[in-house]
């Protein structure tokens, strides 16, 4: 393990360039006063850094589903492992947030119902069994032999044609009314009643099995999927249909979605999934004589609000009624739809989008106004708040509160419905699961996962909760532990967990249970970071990091970092002083005297046992007790509603008050809005007064500034660039940067001109409460509210700090401060729920002082609390218990704290030390001996694919190689077992939707157990080659560069070349004043063209606008208007252009831009009217506008960010289309396109429309393709047609990608590649390589943080061998080796520790010169305390490994064993090279590009040529751009030298789930024909097509001919299970009756190629492909082996076999790119021998390969390298291999 984790230079929020260190596998306690920076350090720095680094290495489909954090402001991160956060979980307060949903118990149960549940018809309650043909056969097979069976098919009444057809097919009898009758009686009339056609009667025995199958299938065919079986006086009905005949309802199999009330489909149709139903009790609340337009329904949104008016009008248009129709005249159907909605009703609605500045159309699902109210109730903590008078809500009578559909509610699992299991306690559910009999392994895994989750909740003291329990009824402690159980159940090690005050709300008795869980997590090998205030938790910690010394700007420093004992002995921080009792919270010398009492009777909410409780008035009462004992139920759910009723109505039946009580203040755990626009000052209601104070300043009136201008939430005052947020998001990155326009001040410049006491409003928002308190001494109203913040310890808080950035403790005190800032004299009851949440002991002391001051004023305070400091100062204590849940709810103590400690209750034990005169110091043990972490990853009984139940031990923090022949099980062990297990384990830490995304393509591994896992990063060779992203983007270099250019780059116009200037309200106002002073300006915005003119004018009138500009004159907005209005525009302002009017102009411009993206100014100056249009962004001196560099429209509009354009061309392929005419080819390629544009071109060139291409001379054909000045060419017309239908598939050789001329290939808008730093643009960088960028960055200085980060990435690219790759090059254009090296660089760049890296043959195909550098990178990974496991086909890496695992001894079935030594065999040399004479024809190749410059290279034909060279030297470019294109040209001119070009790369052939070896090599048809010729097949009338698992007639209908079933286990990995119906044989049972040599066709498909070749030696047609496959070492493969299930080396070997071992008879040019890299040494030897054989047959082979053996035995050598200046590639050597060594063997 690394000795230390170190983060240095941290400047996040208030942290002052701190450095923090800790050791792995420690429990680190972050402490300090509230607001000191603990959360900023733990979460915003350490967690953010670890998560960002790990997620960027994961597949993009997962990374994009998590909102990745921006990089924290930290200079260096060392030794950090992947991080997982468990934050404070304030669950949504609505009825759908339940214990079951938040802990995923519901998800487990839903999955079990879908996998193993029994479906029932909800009407008839009849069990539903969805049969397949094979399942029906299985049912019949259970009937004893010798039983007479009669099969019948249903026959409908009155169908004469059906009767005649049955008679024609030979059927003679029917069963009608229980009697058998001849069918011919009903030829004329049809059967009078529904009857049954008798298909067959037979005795069940082995000899009749084929007959039974044929008869059954016939019955199902005639009965349209339904069959009736009579036997032994019994009747069974089978159906393959999902429609129940009795009800005509159609059902689908049970799925997890059915059991989620969040699903938009299959919810309860009455309550729409909420489980509640809102009804109208008083019909008079709807005024019958009023219309909807006149607001007849008071509980519906008012039509005076544009939003509701728009929606209601759309509803009226859709249903065909008028909003002005009185309610009583509307039809009952429309009334019902208005109130309760209609399923599937979607309304088109036009609404104004402020972000776009225009009206856009959207669609709204209409649920009905009462259901909308129901939705609000569902999400509300207090439903009564949203319930209108005259209405009520109840549990939905249809779904009984579940919110599920009737079908889901009717389902059963082991006799229990979903609702039954929801109502059990967690303990009862755990016992129920333990009593179940053993299940299928897949189901058992889900049950074990559910039991583990339940056990965790039970261990955390929550056995009494039920899954259906709403979270909003839980106490704070219960909520927190519910959240913890969700995260702490994984068994990973090497993870850094960051926990946010996990002890919040826990009783001291419960805290010890939590500590045991955290210790267990640490002992598994993880690092635990705790942000904590609980003094008990220090005894748990291995290290204490104290952040302070104060809060806010007075904190942000690490004041201590060491062991708890050292902390207690040496630290002078407030935390240590309180622990040493140098500072204390004093016990009151005298308790307050009671001023009366509140007596609450018959309290029975939830688990309360009908309590009667008396609470004294005028005192501070603490309600305490273990978690779940009923405290929240007593106070929040019972006392508070009763007191509210008493105050409102003067009495309450369950409440008796003796004394004075006239007011209630309930401060609960609900969080205020956390919008970026909500700040502390707005919450305490001081911002309005501050704005009014500024609006009253003398300068405001002449400048036209009002109170509204001093708000950053209105367009009048907010900065137009950032919208008043103070920051913007740059270049589509989530990182926010300070707004360059307002410098983070939020306001417009004219607003900031106003000052109060020489301070602007922005200056005041940056003040702390401490500074503001003295500043506003002369403003009592503002001062008192700010003073309340200081009183509660929030003096460090900036007044403008957004609420979303406050900690939990700060939120609690802010809410109390808001109340204290408005003191009242009326006797008030203050009810607080755990107010010490998140507070340091010093802050608790201040809070207690405030609470005591309330009782001093005669008020009463009731607190739910566990903090013993608060309990000890209470005047009166109520304790509930004795335990939680059903064992709680009793009042076990009601007395003073001094009396309580003499009782025997959980709280008394915890309170005694706090009331003792000499409180003991926390017990801190000596330095702990941590349990040893597993030294290895242990894999037990791995039997995936061909692994032979092996047990493997892989040492941690070491380099392990797995060697062996191809297909010996290396990939199965490393990727299919180890990677899958790690992937699934890590996914457990995330919510189901993220987990499903991560493991969707991860099949369940066949292994008993894998222990010692850490997070896994896997890099495989067969990764997709379709990424259009650049090389620079892979390592986020492009993001960093774009941020760098955003910060210090200067934009220039691509048109004029001059520096672009920004267009903003400020620049427009300056331009007006400079050029048009003393004139008049009319500021207008165009009328939205999609808006109704009349409606829009009325809307604008309501907003206060008065004028309209059109026809170059002004009109009143009320009208009248002329018949024709040209370019109507709304007038925002008309004003004289004077210096004093600039603030007014600025405000008007800002308002205009807030309503429209484009504005138009009409300027009158000296009698001349000038009109100008402006858009926000950038502009050059010629008036050309460009989007600003923070605008999302920065993608090039021509290539849409791709950087390249697709072009279509047939010019090089005249001979391929020789027999086509231009029209016939166009219409065949583009059948839906009009060919008319071709005619003018043909007419101009004088080419007849019926002329074939072969009839045209070369000049005419070229003209036709390229076109003329007047008419576009055929290629251009095809390109246009192709772009019109981009999804159409075309031959790839006809399409080429060319760089976009508009953006020079970088995909950005034209001005962006004109943004420059030192005359260098992004475009210049993206067209260059690593050395160029490093030189450029050095010119900027490495002191810039971004520059330093980019340098690290560039150095890694150099180390993996990619220094010469162009940074802007698309990843898809890289060679296979380069792409793999890039993936390695991406994974290595994270800098994480404790990660398991899985690499697939990293040195394969690498040039020997590149290998040492790449090996050093891998070694560095291990040195950084990671575990690296590598597959090594060649064994070249094993000599450098710390541990080697040998698998073998053979490929395929004879492999998969664990060996003691290597299974590699010595290989024999092959024949020498071919003599190349001068007479052998040669292929002349020239490539002259910026990347490679080769002129007149001559490659001999009929020989073997190799191309080798270091990475990035241009090998693939030479092969494709040079040799391939030159070969195509030679093929056109002289086909005699070779008649075909075959190109093969290292990627396997694409294969579907149905493609197998028998179909790929066309072996299956001959075998199917043979089987169909057998006597049994003819007797059963089985044709050849029925022997195919790919036809409907032949395939097993349960698995569709695949032989396996994929079991979708929702948030678990998919399970691939052998089909139980066909036994995995793929073909239907009837086909399996035909047997040859003891095997039916399904068994034949499972036979090896060796066996098939032997058994069918007489079938000459199949022998050649079979013998070729066997010769290539693939004889062990099954004939029906699915192509997609083969290993990479097997796929490549298959590909090689098809194209190289079964070559064309005519001379062919073979171009091979890295095909040998995935082969082991034996396969390389076989390939080399075959290549020599091909040459001897007259073929030509050119192969890219760095393995020395290929160069030794080649006829012609080409060695690639870089020019001395490294600007491009060149040939270092090319020539005949003069003396190849024949004695050397493959290494």
Curated annotation (Swiss-Prot):
Locate the residues binding ATP 2: 625-632
Chain residues that bind ATP 4 = 1509-1516
- Keyword annotations: ATP-binding, Cytoplasm, DNA damage, DNA excision, DNA repair, DNA-binding, Excision nuclease, Metal-binding, Nucleotide-binding, Repeat, SOS response, Zinc, Zinc-finger
State whether keyword DNA-binding applies: yes
**First-listed, main subcellular location of the protein, grouped into a coarse class:** cytoplasm
Supply the InterPro entries for this chain: ABC_transporter-like_ATP-bd, ABC_transporter-like_CS, ATP_grasp_subdomain_1, P-loop_NTPase, UvrA, UvrA_DNA-bd, UvrA_inter
Q: Which PANTHER family match?
A: UVRABC SYSTEM PROTEIN A
How it assembles, according to the record, is: Forms a heterotetramer with UvrB during the search for lesions.
What this protein is reported to do is described as: The UvrABC repair system catalyzes the recognition and processing of DNA lesions. UvrA is an ATPase and a DNA-binding protein. A damage recognition complex composed of 2 UvrA and 2 UvrB subunits scans DNA for abnormalities. When the presence of a lesion has been verified by UvrB, the UvrA molecules dissociate.
- Mind telling me what this protein is named? UvrABC system protein A
Q: Which species does this protein come from?
A: Chlamydia muridarum (strain MoPn / Nigg)
Lineage here is: Bacteria, Pseudomonadati, Chlamydiota, Chlamydiia, Chlamydiales
């Amino acid at each position: 393990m690394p000795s230390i984790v170190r983060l240095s230079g941290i400047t996040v929020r208030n942290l002052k360039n701190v450095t923090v260190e800790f050791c792995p596998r420690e429990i680190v306690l972050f402490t300090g006063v509230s607001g000191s920076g603990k959360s900023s350090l733990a979460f915003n720095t350490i967690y953010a850094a670890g998560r960002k680094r790990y997620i960027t290495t994961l597949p993009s489909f997962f990374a994009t589903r998590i909102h990745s954090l921006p990089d924290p402001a930290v200079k260096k991160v060392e030794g950090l492992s992947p991080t997982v956060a468990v934050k404070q979980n304030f669950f949504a307060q609505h009825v759908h947030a339940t214990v079951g949903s938040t802990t995923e118990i519901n998800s487990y149960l839903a999955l079990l119902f879908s996998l193993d549940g029994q479906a029932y018809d909800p009407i008839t309650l009849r069990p539903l069994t969805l049969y397949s043909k094979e399942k029906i056969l299985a049912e019949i097979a259970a009937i004893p032999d010798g039983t007479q069976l009669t099969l019948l098919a249903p026959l409908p009444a009155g169908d004469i044609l059906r009767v005649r057809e049955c008679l024609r097919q030979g059927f003679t009898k029917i069963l009608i009314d229980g009697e058998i009758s001849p069918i011919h009686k009903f030829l004329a009339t049809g059967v009078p009643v529904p009857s049954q056609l008798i298909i067959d009667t037979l005795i069940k025995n082995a000899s009749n099995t084929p007959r039974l199958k044929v008869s059954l299938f016939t019955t199902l065919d005639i009965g349209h999927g339904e069959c009736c079986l009579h036997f032994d006086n019994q009747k069974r009905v089978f159906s393959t249909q999902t429609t129940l005949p009795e009800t005509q309802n159609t059902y689908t199999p049970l799925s997890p979605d059915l059991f989620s009330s969040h699903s938009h489909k299959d919810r309860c149709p009455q309550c729409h999934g909420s489980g509640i139903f809102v009804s109208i009790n008083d019909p008079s609340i709807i005024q019958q004589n009023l219309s909807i337009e006149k607001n007849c329904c008071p509980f519906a949104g008012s039509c005076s609000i544009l939003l509701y008016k728009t929606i209601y009008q759309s509803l009226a248009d859709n249903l065909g009624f008028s909003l002005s129709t009185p309610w009583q005249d509307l039809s009952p159907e429309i009334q019902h739809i208005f109130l309760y909605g209609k399923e599937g009703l979607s309304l088109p609605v036009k609404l104004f989008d402020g972000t776009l500045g225009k009206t856009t159309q959207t669609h709204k699902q209409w649920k009905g106004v009462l259901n909308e109210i129901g939705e609000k109730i569902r999400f509300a903590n207090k439903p009564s708040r949203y319930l209108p008078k005259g209405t009520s809500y109840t549990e939905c009578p249809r779904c009984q509160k579940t919110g599920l559909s009737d079908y889901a509610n009717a389902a059963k699992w082991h006799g229990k419905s979903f609702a039954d299991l929801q109502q059990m306690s967690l303990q009862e559910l755990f016992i129920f699961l333990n009593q179940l009999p053993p299940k299928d392994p897949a189901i058992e895994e889900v049950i074990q996962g559910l039991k583990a989750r339940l056990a965790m909740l039970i261990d955390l003291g929550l056995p009494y909760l039920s899954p259906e329990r709403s979270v909003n009824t839980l106490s704070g402690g219960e909520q927190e532990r519910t959240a913890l159980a969700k995260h702490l159940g994984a068994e990973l090690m090497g993870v850094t967990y960051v926990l946010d005050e996990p002890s919040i709300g826990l009783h001291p008795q419960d805290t010890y249970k939590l500590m045991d869980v955290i210790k267990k997590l640490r002992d598994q090998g993880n690092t635990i970071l705790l942000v904590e205030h609980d003094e008990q938790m220090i005894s748990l910690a291995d290290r204490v990091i104290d952040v302070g010394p104060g809060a806010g700007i007075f904190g942000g420093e690490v004041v201590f970092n060491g062991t708890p004992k050292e902390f207690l002995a040496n630290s002078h921080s407030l935390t240590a002083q309180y622990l040493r009792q140098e500072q204390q919270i004093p016990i009151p010398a005298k308790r307050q005297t009671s001023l009366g009492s509140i007596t609450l009777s018959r309290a029975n909410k939830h688990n309360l046992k009908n309590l009667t409780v008396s609470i004294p008035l005028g005192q501070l009462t603490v309600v305490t007790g273990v978690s779940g004992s009923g405290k929240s139920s007593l106070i929040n759910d019972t006392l508070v509603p009763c007191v509210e009723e008493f105050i409102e109505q003067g009495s309450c039946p369950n409440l008796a008050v003796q004394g004075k009580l006239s007011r209630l203040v309930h401060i609960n755990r609900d969080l205020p809005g956390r919008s970026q626009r909500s700040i502390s000052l707005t919450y305490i209601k001081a911002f309005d007064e501050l704005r009014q104070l500024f609006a009253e300043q003398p300068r405001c009136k002449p400048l036209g500034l009002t109170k509204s201008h001093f708000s950053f939430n209105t367009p009048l005052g907010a900065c137009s660039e950032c919208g008043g947020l103070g920051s913007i998001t740059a270049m589509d990155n989530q990182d926010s940067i300070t707004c360059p326009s307002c410098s983070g001040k939020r306001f417009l410049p004219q607003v900031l001109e106003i000052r109060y006491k020489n301070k602007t409003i922005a200056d005041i928002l940056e003040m702390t409460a401490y500074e503001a308190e003295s500043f506003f001494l002369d403003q009592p109203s503002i001062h008192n509210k700010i003073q309340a913040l200081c009183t509660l310890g929030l003096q460090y808080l900036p007044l403008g700090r957004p609420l979303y950035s406050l900690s939990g403790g700060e939120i609690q005190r802010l809410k109390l401060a808001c109340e204290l800032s408005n003191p009242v004299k009326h006797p008030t009851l203050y009810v607080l729920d755990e107010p010490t949440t998140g507070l340091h002991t010093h802050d608790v002391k201040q809070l207690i002082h405030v609470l005591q001051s309330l009782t001093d004023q005669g008020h009463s305070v009731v607190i739910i609390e566990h903090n013993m400091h608060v309990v000890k100062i209470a005047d009166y204590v109520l304790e509930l218990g004795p335990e939680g849940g059903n064992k709680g709810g009793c009042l076990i103590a009601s007395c003073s704290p001094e009396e309580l400690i003499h009782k025997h209750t959980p709280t008394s034990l915890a309170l005694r030390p706090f009331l003792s005169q000499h409180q003991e110091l926390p017990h801190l043990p000596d330095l702990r001996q941590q349990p040893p972490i597993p030294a290895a990853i242990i894999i037990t009984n791995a039997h995936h694919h061909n692994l032979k139940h092996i047990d493997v031990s892989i040492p941690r923090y070491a380099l392990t190689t797995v060697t062996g022949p191809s297909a010996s099980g290396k990939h199965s062990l490393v990727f299919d077992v180890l990677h899958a297990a790690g992937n699934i384990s890590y996914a457990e830490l995330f919510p189901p939707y993220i987990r499903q995304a991560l493991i969707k393509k991860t099949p369940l591994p066949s292994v008993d157990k894998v222990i010692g896992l850490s997070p896994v990063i896997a890099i495989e060779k067969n990764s997709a080659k379709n990424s259009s992203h650049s090389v620079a983007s892979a390592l986020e270099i492009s993001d960093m560069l774009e941020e760098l250019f955003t910060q210090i780059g200067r934009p220039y116009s691509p048109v004029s070349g001059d520096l672009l200037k920004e267009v903003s309200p400020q620049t427009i106002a300056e331009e007006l004043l400079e050029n048009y002073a003393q004139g008049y300006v009319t500021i207008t915005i165009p009328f939205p063209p999609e808006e109704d003119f009349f409606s829009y004018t009325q809307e604008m009138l309501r907003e206060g606008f008065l004028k309209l500009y059109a026809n170059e004159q002004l009109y009143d907005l009320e009208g009248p208007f002329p018949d024709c209005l040209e370019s109507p525009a709304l007038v925002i302002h008309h004003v004289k252009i004077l210096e004093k009017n600039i603030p007014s102009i600025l405000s008007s411009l800002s308002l205009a831009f807030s309503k429209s993206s484009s504005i138009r100014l009409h300027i009158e100056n000296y009698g001349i009217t000038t009109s100008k249009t402006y858009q926000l962004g950038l502009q050059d001196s010629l008036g050309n506008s460009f989007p600003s560099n923070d605008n999302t429209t920065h993608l090039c509009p021509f290539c849409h960010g791709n950087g390249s354009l697709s072009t279509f061309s047939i010019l090089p392929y005249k001979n391929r289309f020789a027999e086509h005419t231009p029209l016939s080819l166009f219409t065949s390629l583009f059948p839906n396109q009009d060919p008319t544009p071709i005619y003018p071109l043909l007419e101009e060139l004088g080419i007849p429309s019926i002329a074939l291409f072969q009839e045209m001379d070369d000049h005419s054909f070229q003209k036709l393709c390229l076109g003329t000045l007047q008419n576009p060419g055929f290629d251009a017309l095809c390109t246009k047609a192709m772009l019109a239908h981009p999804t159409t598939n075309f031959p790839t050789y006809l399409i080429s990608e060319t760089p976009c001329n508009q953006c020079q290939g970088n995909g950005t808008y034209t001005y962006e590649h004109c943004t420059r730093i030192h005359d260098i643009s992004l475009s210049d960088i993206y067209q260059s390589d690593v050395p160029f960028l490093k030189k450029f960055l050095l010119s900027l200085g490495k002191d810039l943080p971004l520059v330093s980060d980019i340098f690290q990435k560039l150095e890694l690219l150099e180390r993996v061998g990619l220094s010469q790759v162009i940074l802007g090059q698309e990843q898809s254009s890289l060679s296979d080796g380069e792409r793999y090296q890039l993936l390695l660089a991406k994974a290595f760049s994270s800098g994480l520790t404790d990660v398991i890296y899985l690499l697939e043959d990293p040195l394969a195909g690498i040039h020997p010169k590149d290998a040492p550098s790449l090996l050093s990178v891998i070694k560095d990974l291990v040195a950084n305390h990671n575990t690296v496991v590598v597959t090594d086909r060649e064994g070249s890496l094993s000599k450098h490994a710390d541990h080697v695992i040998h698998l073998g001894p053979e490929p395929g079935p004879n492999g998969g064993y664990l060996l003691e030594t290597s299974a590699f065999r010595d290989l024999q040399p092959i024949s020498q090279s071919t003599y190349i004479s001068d007479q052998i024809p040669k292929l002349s190749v020239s490539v002259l590009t910026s990347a490679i410059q080769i002129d007149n290279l001559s490659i001999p034909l009929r020989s073997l040529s190799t191309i080798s060279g270091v990475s990035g030297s241009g090998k693939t470019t030479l092969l494709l751009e040079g040799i391939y294109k030159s070969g195509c040209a030679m093929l056109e001119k002289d086909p005699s030298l070779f008649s075909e070009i075959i190109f093969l790369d290292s990627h396997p052939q694409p294969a579907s789930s149905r493609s197998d070896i028998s179909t790929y090599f066309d072996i299956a048809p001959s075998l199917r024909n043979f089987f169909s010729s057998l006597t049994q097949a003819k007797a059963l009338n089985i044709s050849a097509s029925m022997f195919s698992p790919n036809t409907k007639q032949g395939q097993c209908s349960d698995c569709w001919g695949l032989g396996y079933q994929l079991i979708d286990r929702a948030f678990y990995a998919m399970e691939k299970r052998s089909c139980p119906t066909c036994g995995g044989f793929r073909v239907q049972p009837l086909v399996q009756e035909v047997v040859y040599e003891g095997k039916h066709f399904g068994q034949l498909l499972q036979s090896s190629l060796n066996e098939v070749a032997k058994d069918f030696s007489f079938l000459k047609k199949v022998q050649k492909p079979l013998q070729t496959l066997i010769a290539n070492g693939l004889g062990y493969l099954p004939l029906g082996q699915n192509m997609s299930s083969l290993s990479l080396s097997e796929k490549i070997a298959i590909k090689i076999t098809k194209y190289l071992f079964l070559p064309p008879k005519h001379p062919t040019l073979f171009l091979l790119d890295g095909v040998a890299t995935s082969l082991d040494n034996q396969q390389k030897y076989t390939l080399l021998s075959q290549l020599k054989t091909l040459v001897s047959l007259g073929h030509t082979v050119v192969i890219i390969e760095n393995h020395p053996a290929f160069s030794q035995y080649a006829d012609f050598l080409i060695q690639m390298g870089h020019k001395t200046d490294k600007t491009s590639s060149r040939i270092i050597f090319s020539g005949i291999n003069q003396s190849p060594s024949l004695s050397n063997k493959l290494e």
